[in-house]
């Protein structure tokens, strides 16, 4: 985790805590003590002082993940969400407490840099949707694209939108149950760190998945061997414009 509470219950970012490592900090979810980890192997982060199973949030900590989160105010990062223990939905959730990477304007934004199972992907979507939140996933696909595992075949367009058609060698099983027509779960693939046309070189370039072979229509599991994207939104500015307008 990259943020924690100080003794006055104020949110503190890891960059600030590194300068004051002897201060006490606490997990925003379980309220147990955490310590500053600032070594040479992993990116700087907070970790529980004693082993705790309140969350396995640190599984996807990376510089890429961190840079995305820093685009948002600290109050919107790593927001703890809970399901009411008396809610019947709890029977279908693996966890009753989760830490959203970002929560803003009614959207949960999850940044995924490492492999994730279809079970975990589905469970997070179910959890957040049941709390009335739409979920925006941003997956780091830069290596997949650069190594030509994901190949751009051609473009498509109509009167309302345009985008790309792709072929994916050895497609991930993460999305096997994903419904590409689900308006409450938005899937975005980042294909490059920088767009050649982009003045802000910190934004990167991505595309929103709008179609994949779908189990609801094709009587088989969702198959990302072939999928289509929209070119809009294509960067952080356009994404936030969509989110603020609640148009995703």
Regions found by a protein language model. Give the residues of each.
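Cofactor-binding loop segments of dinucleotide-utilizing enzymes, especially the Rossmann-like FAD-
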Residues: 140
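Active-site metal-binding core of divalent-cation-utilizing nuclease and nuclease-like domains
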Residues: 13-19, 26, 33-36, 67-123, ...
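Residues at the starts of beta-strands that form the adenosine-phosphate
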Residues: 134
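Anion (oxyanion) recognition and catalysis
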Residues: 129
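N-terminal cysteine/histidine-rich coordination modules
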Residues: 1-75
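Non-catalytic C-terminal interaction segments of nucleic acid-processing enzymes
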Residues: 1-22, 26, 145-248
